[in-house]
């Protein structure tokens, strides 16, 4: 079955093409750290021949506690992104939380991301659609894979069909997430075979029921990522940090930066193998 291709400049994203890495850091902690992390990703992905898009947030507007670090904000964040682009020539993805931010952010980065908690907010969807930018939609933890077609339709009605869908797990009772790998293909089916990527970092989140920040299961990142890649997807979303224990957001789920190359070697091997198989129709 023909898969939809979404272009991010010269990077082609599709379920049957070699996977694209959307990776970086959770939130911009400082200009220097962002440059260091991006440089490492660029070095590794160029060595391995993996198409790459740098990811970071300028504002984590949905932190559990009002006292948690949110980021440098819109103005400073865009300055850092511009400097990263100039230094490394990379494409960039970041999230927006308000309709008023959409065009400002789209003028700087290449992919704007609709956060999971906001994915059904029609005003935000419409504002993002109007930018004409490539859109990455995080599947809400509380929305079934089959319902993602409605969000894609909203973007299409707004004149934007350059949509990527991203799974980051589903609620499993309270304070836990699981990933339904069967849902990846369901999302493809309800979205005209739009590219589907897997956010393994946030799928590893779990919570202390009485705590003010998410915990995580970093030790299981390879197992979960390998399982997701084996389905046959367009890309992988992974955050890394040189010192996860002291990261300002989601450190317990972050890949140690020095493990990036061996991790990606595994992912590339699985992706190459899975996509070498002919399509097998088991419906008939």
From Swiss-Prot:
- What Pfam families does this protein map onto? DAHP_synth_1
Report the sequence similarity comment from the record.
Answer: Belongs to the KdsA family.
**EC category:** transferase
Where does the signal sequence lie? none
What is its pathway? Carbohydrate biosynthesis; 3-deoxy-D-manno-octulosonate biosynthesis; 3-deoxy-D-manno-octulosonate from D-ribulose 5-phosphate: step 2/3; Bacterial outer membrane biogenesis; lipopolysaccharide biosynthesis
Q: Where would you say this protein principally sits, based on its record?
A: cytoplasm
Q: Which GO terms describe its biological process?
A: keto-3-deoxy-D-manno-octulosonic acid biosynthetic process
Protein name per Swiss-Prot or TrEMBL: 2-dehydro-3-deoxyphosphooctonate aldolase
What reactions does this protein catalyze? Answer: D-arabinose 5-phosphate + phosphoenolpyruvate + H2O = 3-deoxy-alpha-D-manno-2-octulosonate-8-phosphate + phosphate
Which EC number applies? 2.5.1.55
Keyword ATP-binding recorded: no
Q: Give me the Gene Ontology terms describing cellular component.
A: cytoplasm
Question: What lineage is this protein's organism placed in?
Answer: Bacteria, Pseudomonadati, Pseudomonadota, Gammaproteobacteria, Enterobacterales
Q: Where in the cell is it found?
A: Cytoplasm
Q: Name one GO molecular function term.
A: 3-deoxy-8-phosphooctulonate synthase activity
Keyword field: Cytoplasm, Lipopolysaccharide biosynthesis, Transferase
Tell me the PANTHER family matching this sequence.
Answer: PHOSPHO-2-DEHYDRO-3-DEOXYHEPTONATE ALDOLASE
- Top-rank taxon, per record: Bacteria
């Amino acid at each position: 079955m023909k898969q939809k291709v979404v272009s991010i400049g010269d990077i082609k994203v599709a379920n049957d093409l070699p996977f694209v890495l959307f990776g970086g850091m959770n939130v911009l902690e400082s200009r220097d750290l962002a440059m260091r992390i991006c440089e490492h990703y660029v070095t590794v992905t160029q060595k391995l021949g993996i198409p790459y898009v740098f990811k970071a947030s300028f504002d984590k507007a949905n932190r559990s506690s009002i006292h948690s670090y949110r980021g440098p904000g819109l103005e400073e964040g865009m300055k850092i992104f511009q400097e990263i682009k100039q230094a490394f020539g990379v494409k960039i993805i970041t999230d927006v939380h308000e309709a008023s931010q959409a065009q400002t952010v789209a003028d700087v980065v290449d992919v704007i991301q609709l956060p999971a908690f906001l994915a059904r907010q029609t005003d935000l969807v419409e504002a993002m659609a109007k930018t004409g930018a490539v859109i990455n939609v995080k599947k809400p933890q509380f929305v079934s894979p089959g319902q993602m077609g409605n969000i894609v339709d909203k973007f299409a009605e707004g004149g934007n069909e350059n949509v990527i869908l991203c799974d980051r797990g589903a609620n499993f009772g309270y304070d836990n997430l699981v990933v339904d790998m069967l849902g990846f293909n369901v999302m493809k089916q309800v979205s005209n075979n739009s590219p589907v990527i897997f956010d393994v970092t946030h799928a590893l989140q779990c919570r202390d029921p009485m705590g003010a920040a998410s915990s995580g299961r970093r030790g299981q990142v390879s197992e979960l990522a390998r399982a997701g890649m084996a389905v046959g997807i367009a890309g992988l979303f992974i955050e890394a940090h040189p010192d996860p224990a002291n990261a300002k957001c989601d450190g317990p789920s972050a890949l140690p930066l020095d493990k990036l190359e061996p991790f990606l070697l595994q992912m590339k091997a699985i992706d190459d193998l899975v996509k070498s198989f002919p399509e097998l129709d088991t419906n008939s």
